[in-house]
């Protein structure tokens, strides 16, 4: 793209009910260190503030700037690294000659906080950060989180709920005529009418509620430069309606051509099934080649127009984005607070790709990054790895090389690049498409070359792999390479469930595929004389899961011989297929009814079943088993989940044969499968996988957190 880049995360409420609380939080001084935060270590080699874009008038003066072209307001702290959307967007514009100033986590109760850099010449850019602000702030049970990894010192409370809307309105009140462009995961996934889990209702496009002029959705490298060039040429912002990857509002459709009309706001609020129909049309038009322009009507002759998606990046463009002159650190202003915790997760990790053709129903990536895989070149990745080895804090370990799915290193098929993705077919579900080119050799060679770099001791693969793709590979070279060199005792994969009915709704492969993968993994481990374990990620109360399926999952966990520490209760985040199912009660692809566990108590029971050994879950598990008609699982025999009487202090809730769950206790199995071995000497006798107790990653946020933020899984 000859200097055109960015992660469209610009790359992500009860406002009145929490107003007093928000005002208190908003008044905190950015960069102040909470009592629990460690002091930042002395690191004289860190980049100076001149390596970052301006965050103050003094910084502007040091560069000789009288005025910024753009001021970027973001809900995250300033980390100048390509895993942070704000950094990518601002560096892309900087590379094109635009002057960009940064205001991170302003006090949203004080208009003066967004005036510190003055009014920009061309406009304001706004994003909530690498995560949707509501997902960042609240757990699936709607309890406020106590920490914020994207804030200095990990202290929560420096970002408002629904940050894009709050920031947008604050700018509009302060600079009435300034163009406002919103983007990032929060704006992208709320670009049209969407279900909001936290208020349990349908909400309008965030473009309308934020007061913005243009919304960039998806990965916005192309769009942001086109918008900047148009504004720089003197085009009024209300005339910038032609750029792919953007959403705008209009009062007339007279000059809007070749569009599909979605159900109106009135239709959507009158009947949930209309939302399901609308969502299905939207997800069928997420491809840059085949996607149509979409129009969503609102009352009073207001129309929200979504232009077709922006073109995917070429490999050369991906390289340009990754190799812009990032400082690759948090801003020095955060040193006193101990830095930004999220940076530690990615400092020595490498993003090699974006996009995902896995298309899991509960994941937001299809709606944000698209299904066409975009890959950096081998040479670019190697250059970044060499850069990491020169960091004084590098200890020889590259923590991750991957993306949404690590072992995807090329588009699913050649057809996608010429004709676009299939509208009514998935690449991997219900089985691997016959046209798919399954090739893991490029990624395998990349891992080999990274291992050979001077100073590199080990390269980990933590992004997650798609095991059905690996099983479809005629060669087992990648899996052999993975378990011999790139697994640290545990390989995390995401079967998510064991019920084929639920797996079908999720868009995941059948249990048989997962069991076959586990058998192959164990066979190769025996061949190499290794003791490594598959650690499965599991989701409870996903649409399609009744109490029967939840009990099936609990029995599978019993047969693994260990208790998962990290269990993800289904979180209905904006604009996923699963969230549409949760809200409407139907599968939008077929319009067939689907069971949904909406009641918080039922969701708690389904989750407790997976962790039935925990004493605090005893009552919920017993109630769930009785509701499911499975009293046979209450007793003292080895197949039982719990005993007839509550556990005494120091005991687990588990039924007979499960031991105490402590080191040396006996595990238990029963289901047919690959064979399981519990952790720390516990003994199993069959089950879904060979597994070891592991905390895993916090997966409470939306799928893979949009572009490059947060944990990833496949």
Feature map (PLM): residue ranges:
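N-terminal pre-triad scaffold of radical SAM enzymes
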Residues: 73-78, 335-364, 397
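Conserved SAM/AdoMet-binding glycine-rich loop
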Residues: 65, 72, 88, 103, ...
